[in-house]
A protein has these predicted regions:
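Conserved small/polar residues in nucleotide/adenosyl-binding loops
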Residues: 218-219
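Membrane-water interface of transmembrane alpha-helices
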Residues: 141-155
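Core segments of transmembrane alpha-helices
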Residues: 52-56, 107-115, 172-186
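Transit-peptide-like, low-complexity N-terminal presequences
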Residues: 1-31
Length: 220
């Protein structure tokens, strides 16, 4: 089996449900135009992860300089590379504990660091910074250590409302790393830093409440 066939087979085994923003990044951009050519090169997933960290740092630097459009675009490139490294690792069977640790570390530093950096640049208030950071990290902790554990115990989960409508069509409605990056990038490019913090924090809290209700509803 040649590389093209191997990758196409792997693509068919990819999960069928995507977050909408994740579908845009993974399926419409990376799988269509980037993954196959990149997989034929000696470039490693860890190199892509390090490259993503460089683009994130450049985004921070351009924020400091006041070049917000460039900073927002660089942050989008970081997010795209963040998707590419994991997909490349799976397709080339190069997944490793070190790679996973590196990827998670870069993501945590970038997504937490951006709000802290904006505060120290006097672009957002302390309240907005804390709201975004607390909402994001509470969401991550509860979904990782409680909700996902509950889902593993259930054969299925009862969803309702708009999320059910999207799921029936193969899409997950909620916030993920790609949507978070898009919101941050848009906020940077528009210079709407304070609003971006409250929008991001609000979406995290709303999505968390929905997921907790869905888990409780399933147990009934």
């Amino acid at each position: 089996m040649d590389l093209d066939e191997k990758l196409k087979k792997a693509q068919r085994l990819e999960k069928k449900s995507y977050y909408i923003s994740e579908y845009l990044f993974r399926v419409l951009i990376i799988q269509k135009f980037i993954l196959l050519p990149l997989a034929k090169t000696p470039i490693t997933p860890n190199f892509i992860t390090i490259l993503s960290a460089i683009f994130a740092a450049l985004s921070f630097y351009f924020i400091y300089l006041g070049h917000f459009i460039c900073a927002g675009l660089l942050f989008l490139v970081y997010s795209l590379l963040d998707h590419i490294d994991g997909m490349l690792a799976r397709y080339k069977n190069l997944s490793s504990k070190i790679g996973k640790l590196l990827d998670v570390s870069v993501d945590n530093l970038t997504f937490n660091g951006i709000f802290i950096f904006l505060f120290f640049c006097d672009l957002i208030s302390l309240q907005a910074c804390i709201f975004a950071l607390v909402s994001m990290n509470i969401y991550n902790c509860i979904t990782t250590f409680y909700i996902l554990n509950q889902l593993r115990k259930l054969k299925s989960i009862k969803r309702f409302g708009l999320k059910k409508w999207f799921l029936d069509r193969g899409f997950l409605l909620g916030i993920d790393a790609s949507l978070l990056a898009i919101l941050i990038s848009a906020g940077i490019m528009l210079g709407a830093f304070e609003l971006m913090c409250y929008v991001v924090g609000g979406i995290f809290l709303f999505d968390l409440c929905y997921r907790l209700i869905a888990v409780s509803y399933t147990h009934l």
